[in-house]
A protein has these predicted regions:
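Extracytoplasmic "Venus flytrap"/periplasmic binding protein-like
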Residues: 97-183, 217, 221-225, 316-325, ...
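Conserved C-terminal helix/tail region of periplasmic/extracytoplasmic solute-binding proteins
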Residues: 42-47, 52-57, 220, 430-432, ...
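Short, well-ordered beta-strand elements
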Residues: 73-84, 105-110, 134
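Extracytoplasmic/periplasmic substrate-recognition and gating elements
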Residues: 100, 106, 128, 198, ...
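Short, low-complexity disordered leader/linker segments with a strong preference
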Residues: 1-76, 100, 491-501
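Glycine-centered hinge/linker elements that transmit conformational signals in sensory
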Residues: 236-239, 276-306, 355
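Short, polar/charged alpha-helical segment
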Residues: 66-68, 84-106
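Hinge/lid segment of periplasmic solute-binding proteins
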Residues: 50-69, 140-209, 349-356
Length: 501
């Protein structure tokens, strides 16, 4: 309800803002895009007779870097995030290091609950102009904030060649060097420009993906091969079912991720940030859904919604009903590890690999985890100072390495793999005590596979709907006509997207 009210507030403010801008134009007074305010759009259930929010466009304006870049002004930069004590401790160490270079840039680091809590608080504060300088974000968060152009674009900052003086007597260019740009894992970096206008709104901070966890002890004992394609996955499930008829061979945590990833692997349409947004009702997508329905009917799989909890619980189970494979977040590796006994021994060894692909060379795995965005402010020096801080954290190999080891998330830089401490961390990788290192190692090995989906006001609705669609199609009574049931389910999902998006 709160999100819905804020959505209405936002739509009204956009209309008033447009009127005000028109009036200013008539009076030959330039409109200041930095003064626009916004609240959150409702991605879950807006009435269609409510004002339709605008889509983000280039009219939001590309941030113009001051001629002198950072002028040494004393500023306080507020950073909203979700870090617990262990990660905040790492951050604080690097804030201190940053302040040795820029003592007049004071960082106010604030933990704001969950990712959704950050989104909701920022959205509320945008309506009254008290938003922070920097915030953890996901793409759909930025799409909401951008309904009124609240997020500063980063393109001019990234490309700036202005030389900035630091307190230790050294200098750096304000923007990114070619070497720094090239060090980012491509899929993580590309996420910042997926909003339909070609502009860069976010920088990757720390990331995760989905990986395939499997019971290595069971696989080795039964001569099973780890599936690398979906065809091999079906064969593996069949063999496991023969060996253990009570098992559910595969658990998949995120129905939405599964659907979207299959679209990426097939190269079929899902959504678009511009034009017609909801494109997922097509023959290719209906076909793979039908295939997974057949797997479900054979008892090969379950999902988080169907199981009623994360499928890691089924994977680590020592009861009669268990799974031997689980597809879930790379950042949750320790939850995929069974409990050790009193002597520290685990009931089985866990293996980790890339999720199955189609075998068509179009390998894709989802990019997840927080990015950071910078908000527009009246004082351009706050934006520039915010950029310097974000640049410092996202290009620091030492910070990325230490943060990754503490968090279980994956660093966003390729070169972190060569960091001595991180290389030692990866060298310990195993399917027991150091399972987080094994997960990170797999993630780094598949750095060319990462994808992100278009972000727009309504993209989270599409995500929810395709997840619900997959669940429904696995279990629904088809009345003897599976194709008709699936077609209707797709049509209904599109209608829900158009109504609520």
């Amino acid at each position: 309800m709160t999100k819905r009210i804020l959505s209405i507030m936002l739509a009204v403010m956009l209309v008033l803002g447009a009127v005000a801008m028109t009036a200013c134009s008539a009076g030959n007074t330039p409109a200041d895009n930095d003064q626009q305010t916004a609240g959150p759009a409702d991605n879950s259930g807006a009435n269609t007779d409510e004002p339709a929010p605008a889509e983000p466009t280039k009219a939001n304006g590309n941030f113009e870097v001051p001629e002198a870049g950072y002028d040494g002004s004393e500023v306080t930069i507020t950073f909203y995030h979700t870090m617990g004590t262990n990660l905040s401790d790492v951050l604080d160490l690097y804030i201190a290091e940053f302040n040795k270079l820029y003592p007049n840039i004071h960082i106010d680091s604030q933990k704001i609950g969950s990712y959704d809590d950050v989104r909701d608080q920022v959205s509320t504060e945008i309506t009254v102009g008290t938003q922070p300088n920097i915030a953890y974000c996901y793409p759909d968060h930025v799409a909401l904030y951008n309904l009124a152009g609240a997020v500063a674009t980063l393109d001019n900052l990234i490309d700036s060649q202005i030389e900035v003086a630091r307190a230790d007597g050294s200098t750096e260019i304000l923007g990114l060097t070619d070497e720094q740009k090239g060090d980012f894992i491509p899929g993580y970096y590309a996420e910042g420009a997926q909003f339909g206008d070609g502009l860069m709104y976010t920088m990757p901070f720390s990331k995760s993906t989905e990986v395939l966890y499997y019971n290595k002890t069971f696989f080795d004992a039964n001569g099973l091969t780890v599936p690398t394609t979906w065809e091999e996955m079906e064969a593996a499930c069949a063999k496991i079912k023969e060996i253990d008829p009570n098992s559910i061979p595969l658990g998949y945590d995120s129905e939405s991720n599964w659907f979207i990833t299959m679209c990426e692997q097939y190269g079929s349409e899902y959504t678009s940030a511009s034009g017609d947004h909801y494109l997922f009702n097509n023959e290719t997508n209906r076909s793979f859904i039908k295939m997974f329905r057949e797997w479900y009917q054979k008892g090969y799989l379950t999902t988080q919604k169907l199981y009623g909890a994360y499928t890691s619980g089924l994977f680590t189970s020592t009861g009669d009903v268990k799974s031997y494979m689980s597809i879930g977040s790379s950042a949750g590796a320790t939850y995929q590890r069974p409990a050790a006994d009193a002597d520290g021994n685990y009931p089985f060894e866990v293996g980790i690999s890339t999720i199955p692909q189609l075998g068509n060379g179009n390998n894709k795995v989802i990019s997840q985890g927080p990015s950071v965005c910078i908000f527009k402010k009246d004082n351009a020096q706050e934006v520039v100072a915010s950029w310097l801080f974000i640049k410092y954290l996202t290009t620091s190999v030492d910070f990325q390495a230490e943060f990754s080891m503490a968090s279980g998330y994956v660093p966003v830089l390729k070169s972190v793999a060569n960091n001595e401490a991180y290389a030692s961390f990866l060298g310990q990788a195993d399917g027991g005590k150091f399972i987080s290192a094994l997960s990170a190692k797999v993630c780094l090995e598949q750095e060319e596979y990462y994808y992100t989906s278009p972000a727009f006001n309504g993209s989270s609705t599409a995500r929810d709907q395709v997840g619900a669609l997959l669940t429904k199609c696995l279990t629904a009574d088809d009345g003897g006509d599976a194709d008709a049931m699936i077609e209707q389910a797709f049509e209904d999902a599109i209608s829900e997207c158009e109504y609520h998006g």
